[in-house]
């Protein structure tokens, strides 16, 4: 009940700001955890949220994130069929295995080569580091500056081109999913 109240309070905060979230994804994918996924599914139906992002790490094990991927993959909330009756679309979400190594082009090459979904999302947390700024720091286990440098690099653009990966905005992604739900 407290999860439901908290989610409704967060929804009301957005509504008061005249915003309507286009997708659901819980912090560290908590929206797929047992009990919570049922509450989130009710929220999706009640507020007609069009997209739910699902952790979609597929392929061979990557240490140290193998256990996380295994756990998330076996939860019923991680499966598109759990969300089917909500009339929302589901979108696979990749990158859990790269946390802490997101600036490594070889790791990206392996991850992107495994993705078979025509439309999917990958996780990055780029940012600009401000040395000495204790107020706005966080506990992210990687370098946001290194990630920003990586996704702005010529090598990154070349890798995407080589693997035939076309970056699109989230808005374009949702539009494509709505136009072609089987994508």
Locate the predicted segments by residue.
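Active-site histidine-anchored catalytic micro-motif
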Residues: 25-31
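Terminal accessory/targeting
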Residues: 1-23, 34-183
């Amino acid at each position: 009940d407290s999860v439901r109240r908290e989610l409704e309070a967060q929804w009301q905060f957005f509504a008061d700001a005249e915003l309507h979230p286009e997708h659901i994804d819980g912090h560290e994918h908590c929206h797929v955890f047992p009990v919570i996924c049922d509450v989130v599914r009710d929220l999706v139906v009640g507020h007609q949220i069009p997209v739910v992002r699902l952790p979609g790490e597929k392929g061979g094990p990557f240490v140290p994130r193998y256990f996380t991927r295994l756990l998330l993959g076996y939860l019923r909330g991680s499966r598109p069929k759990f969300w089917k009756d909500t009339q929302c679309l589901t979108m696979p979400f990749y990158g859990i295995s790269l946390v802490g190594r997101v600036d490594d082009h070889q790791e990206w090459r392996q991850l992107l080569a495994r993705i078979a979904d025509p439309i999917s999302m990958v996780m990055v947390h780029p940012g600009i580091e401000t040395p000495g700024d204790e107020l706005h720091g966080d506990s992210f286990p990687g370098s946001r500056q290194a990630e920003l440098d990586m996704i702005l690099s010529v090598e990154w653009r070349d890798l995407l081109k080589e693997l035939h990966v076309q970056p699109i905005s989230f808005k374009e992604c949702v539009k494509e999913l709505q136009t072609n739900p089987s994508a």
